[in-house]
Amino acid sequence: MTNPTSPPVLTELKLTPAVKDTVNGALDHGRMLSVAYVSPDGKPELSFRGSVQAYSDTQLAIWVRNPEGGIVQAVRSGKPHISLLYGQLAPEKVFLTFRGRGRIDSAEAVRKAVYENSPELERNLDKDRKGVALVIDLDSVDGFIAGTVLKMRR
C-alpha cells in the first residue's frame, strides 16, 4: 500500500501568483474578503470588503471609501491588527487567512494605485476619490490553494 504524498507547504511570506490572482479577482467572481479588526473602544468588528487587493509580495491593500469609517478609526487609534478571510469550495477549494498590521498611506502615488487597482464596481462608489488607501503589512498567511498548504510567516 502506498502513502499519498503530502501537499507542498510554503513557509516564506511571499504571496504566490495564485494567491494574488484569487484576491484580486474575488469580486469579479462574486466573492468578497471578510475583514476583522478591533474598534477604538475594543470591540471586535467584521465587514466585507470588495476592494481588497494584493499590493506587493508581502502586502495587501484596501480602498476604504469612507475616510472616517470604523477600520480607519481603528488603525489611527493604535489598533492596527487586521485579519482577512477568504473561502471558496468551487471550482476548487481555496481557504486563505491573512494577518497583519494596517496603516493609512496618504502618498498620492499609493492612493492612486490602490484606487485604480480596485474593481470598477468599488471605484464607481467613490468617483471623487474621497476614500483612503489602507495598506496591510502581512505577518502571516495560512490556508490551502492550488494543491499547496500555506503556513507563511514574516
Give, region by region, the residue ranges found by the protein language model.
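Binding-site signature for planar aromatic cofactors or substrates
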Residues: 1-154
